[in-house]
Amino acid sequence: MEKVTENSSSFMYTIWLVLALICLGYYIVCATYAGVGSSFIFIWLMGAVFFGLIFAVRVLEIKGIIHVAKVLRICFIVIMATGASLFIFIEALIIKGMMAKPKDNCDYIIVLGCQIRGDHITRSLKNRLDVAVSYAIDNPDTTIIVSGGRGKGENTTEAFAMYNYMVSKGIDGSRIIQEDKSTDTSENMKYSVQYIENTDSLVGIVTNNFHIARSRLLARHAGLNNTCGMPAESDHVLFINYMVRDCLLYTSPSPRDGL
């Protein structure tokens, strides 16, 4: 029995080390791929430190150097179990949003902006715009709202860059409304709803797949009662980062999120 307990203990502290190394490795991959200033990747460095500290405490405890009180151990297990359960539940909502199917003949679609570099759209934004262009061609009576202000390092508003891209793809500029004040997803919805005459209108939300669920939640908070998701492909390298990021932001759906 003692050997089983010892093996179980050894397995558990090895798990913490593996988690720390995975977080550190993914942080290095993201930082190399997108730069250290890329949205939210610092969470992986924090995760590496967090799991590394747990590993260190477990090693010191097994060696008899320190002792962790039983009540603290129970509190830790309860907190971790609660956090893991909440994480799984929210990720299930995000995955459900990713599988959304656009409805035909929307009255409006809102294309959510994200960072541009100078005057140039990024890959993530191009993916969103390509979905919007395809939908606009198939649904010629739909009004398009491109939503995004001007952020740091941007020579123009995201809305204007999106407008130019869609016009270059053959979409009539008279169909496109530019909402150019928003700086985050909450403001995207808050300011875009002002251009929608009837909040019961069918409104499609165009954004990257991981972002659909929270965007529709924010749309409801802004007063839109009838929305559907129009998911665009996400960056494959940063996909896990974005999934975790939106999960954490889901519990507080109105902060500045950079999208």
Residue ranges and their predicted role:
Residues 82, 89-244:
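A structural signal for short, hydrophobic/glycine-enriched beta-strand patches
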Residues 47-79:
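Cytosolic-side transmembrane helix boundary signature
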Residues 20, 77-80, 84:
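Residues within membrane-spanning alpha-helices of integral membrane proteins
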Residues 11-60:
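Membrane-embedded alpha-helical segments of integral membrane proteins
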Residues 1-4:
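Short, Lys/Arg-rich, polar N-terminal cytosolic tail immediately upstream
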Residues 6-13, 17, 40, 66, ...:
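Membrane-water interface of alpha-helical transmembrane segments
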Residues 250-259:
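Single conserved hydrophobic/aromatic residue that forms the stacking wall/gate
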Residues 23, 27, 83, 87-90:
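Helical transmembrane-bundle signal
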